[in-house]
A protein has these predicted regions:
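Basic, Lys/Arg-enriched alpha-helical interface segments
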Residues: 2-61
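Juxtamembrane helix-loop transition sites at the ends of transmembrane segments
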Residues: 43-46, 66, 95
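Compositionally biased, intrinsically disordered low-complexity regions enriched in proline and serine
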Residues: 18-20, 33, 63-64, 71-74, ...
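Enriched for short, Lys/Arg-rich terminal
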Residues: 70, 74-103
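Basic/aromatic recognition patch in beta-strand/loop cores that engages polyanionic ligands
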Residues: 49-80
Length: 103
């Protein structure tokens, strides 16, 4: 099992890093991104609590909260875990999630 960061999630990680770096410095940005990846690694072992994505999103998958962000993921057809997107708690999540779904 591998963790696959999908394109939209990769773009969100870049945005999170830049925002955090610009606001609180590179050390904090590095720590936050490292912590996010550590959380990704805990998905398979259930070291973090994930919840099913609500039916109104129209996609099978799960999400968990990490600090001020929600991480959305799903099991890929080969069994790997796909990180679909990462959204800030203030974002209108339903619209952003639909925008970030792979086409």
């Amino acid at each position: 099992m591998a963790i696959r960061v999908q394109e939209a999630a990769s773009l969100r990680l870049d945005e999170i890093y830049r925002y955090t770096r610009d606001r609180w410095g590179a050390e904090q940005a590095d720590r936050y991104i490292t912590d996010l990846f550590a959380a990704f690694d805990q998905i398979e072992s259930h070291g973090i609590t994930s919840r099913p994505i609500p039916a109104e999103f129209g996609v099978d998958g799960f999400y968990f909260r990490h600090a001020h962000h929600f991480v959305y993921w799903r099991r890929l057809s080969n069994g790997d875990i796909g990180i679909v997107t990462i959204l800030h708690e203030r974002m209108h999540q339903m619209d952003r999630f639909r925008e970030d779904l792979p086409k």
